[in-house]
């Protein structure tokens, strides 16, 4: 196993997780459950391919993907914040909605039920001279940027306040609903970028191409105890397990079924180790009147 090849592949695999987990931290620190990351990523991936296909520019695809993630985030925000719907139920519904919507428009735009035509991407390989894909840099910087916002800015203080003590925050003039709307919007944009990277790295959209990555990202948020840097480290750990799975696939001495379950087994073990010890934001998932 080539260490350089392992590292470069691990980084590429980790980028969608890093984007989505960073967005998940922002939303959950404000008190909104982020089971919707899978749907945000899927919406971002599809919108990125549509934007790139019709414009010929991957940068337009990036903007389109951000809008795609934001679209589903706004549905999530309106239903859970304004109408006070159950956040877990809405999270499941958003993910199913994203699958249905992308499948419908895949057929409408590209006359296919499985995949889009190939589109222009950024390249995505790590060369000796550095990274040739700007989204790699953005993905690696996502967690430090979120950490700075959460812990070093007035907005971050408000996010933490409404996630822990919304009544106290409201009593000193902080609009809990406004802060949560913004936090969920940021979550949608960042998770959408995770989908953008995934789609443009593969140069096409395929049906349900996120394949559970949003759920692994939210697992990283929990494993990282709602800290963006720790969540990023968890993303790298899960990406390393996925890379190991890929590079061991040609090893006939190990049963293929065991190799395929390595990343998911690691997620289960990691979460089992923090259950009961990880303390979420006090107001996470609670309906605000």
Question: For each predicted feature, which ranges?
Answer:
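Cytosolic-side transmembrane-helix boundaries in multi-pass membrane proteins
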Residues: 145, 154, 164-178, 248-289
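Hydrophobic alpha-helical transmembrane segments
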Residues: 7-10, 14, 39, 43, ...
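Transmembrane alpha-helical segments in multi-pass inner-membrane proteins
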Residues: 205-264
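Helix-loop-helix "hairpin" substructures at the membrane interface of multi-pass membrane proteins
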Residues: 57, 130-205, 228-233
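Membrane-interfacial amphipathic/re-entrant helices at transmembrane-helix boundaries
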Residues: 1-20, 33, 47, 55-60
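Transmembrane helix-bundle core of multi-pass membrane transporters
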Residues: 87, 98-153, 203, 207, ...
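Hydrophobic core segments of alpha-helical transmembrane domains in multi-pass membrane transport
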Residues: 20-21, 45-49, 99-103, 138-148, ...
